[in-house]
Amino acid sequence: MAKSVRSSKKKVKRVVPDAVAHIYSSFNNTIVTITDRQGNALSWATSGGSGFRGSRKSTPFAAQVAAERAADMALEYGVKNVDVLVKGPGSGRDSAIRALNAKNLKVTSITDVTPLPHNGCRPPKKRRV
């Protein structure tokens, strides 16, 4: 019986020197997505997916760990420079940007793209603890 000879094709990772880091930080979680300029996702990580559960997901340290994990995956694509788009009111915004900077990604610009209503929907009632 003849063996079929199969040529193995390795998937070539494309090189993306410039990328965009989208940091969405809510009151409960932080999501870091690194995309190319067209918006195609290269890597992403969340605080919850990084092993933090419950109230620890919303901490700045959890956001830092998520940003480091996303940066490690993005470095495999050859990312050197990132523009940072920050969205949301959460506590992990600053620490996620610092973590990207510490991973030898040059932060070229930081833009706040938090959506602000022009008096749209009624917000949730204030907490009484």
UniProtKB/Swiss-Prot annotation:
Gene field: rpsK
GO terms, biological process = translation
Q: How would you summarize the oligomeric state and partners of this protein?
A: Part of the 30S ribosomal subunit. Interacts with proteins S7 and S18. Binds to IF-3.
Organism this protein belongs to: Francisella tularensis subsp. holarctica (strain LVS)
- Asked if Ribosomal protein is a keyword of the record, the answer is yes
Picking any one GO molecular function of the record gives:
rRNA binding
Q: Name one GO cellular component term.
A: ribonucleoprotein complex
What PANTHER family does UniProt report for this protein, alphabetically? 40S RIBOSOMAL PROTEIN S14/30S RIBOSOMAL PROTEIN S11 (PTHR11759)
Question: What protein am I looking at?
Answer: Small ribosomal subunit protein uS11
